[in-house]
Amino acid sequence: LIARRWERLYNRLPDGFVVETPLYAGGHLGVTKMEQVENEEFSLEKVVPEVVEYVEKELKTPTPVIAAGGIWTREDIEHAFDLGASGVQMGTRFACTYEGDASDRFKQAYIDATEEDVVIIQSPAGLPGRALRSPFIDKYLREGTVGNKPCIANCLTHCRYRTERKTFCIAQALIDAFFGNWEEGLFFCGTNVTRITKKEYVADIIAELFGPQENK
């Protein structure tokens, strides 16, 4: 529907389709209901081939399909390619690189995370999201709202914080997390956050995934 609407109104088709599985991804999970988060119908194995087929048969374009959610190893990448994806999106894998611009406290929160620290919340947009259980999120899960700051961005079409002052300002909470405010931040993460044990250089991760790269 989105692709056809853009084609009709703007004579443009997407440059690519990112297919994200809620089973493992971080942040907003691409589904609308909490019970859909663990539904295997939204696995990469199910959805990627369907989207690839749609692009080939309906759009008739070489538009790339990019798999996201839970991609960590070279084997994960190759599996995504076997499903028909043209590329992968890796977020959590690179979150604790030295080159990443998040604060050291943000990165340490990832490094310290355990499986019990990873929770599913309903965001101010009314959508499921995966995040670390920070003091901020603990209070939100207990009380349903932690809103005591102004709406700073008017960034969402649907936002309970802007309209009702319930839940919280997601823009402010993400900024707080980025700058390392553990007490008041929303630390979105994927399930693979528990596999992070240290900060790394991007080059070392690339070498692990694809082999050492020669300087050119």
What do the predicted segments below correspond to?
Residues V18:
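Glycine/serine-rich phosphate-binding loop and adjoining beta1-alpha1 elements at the start
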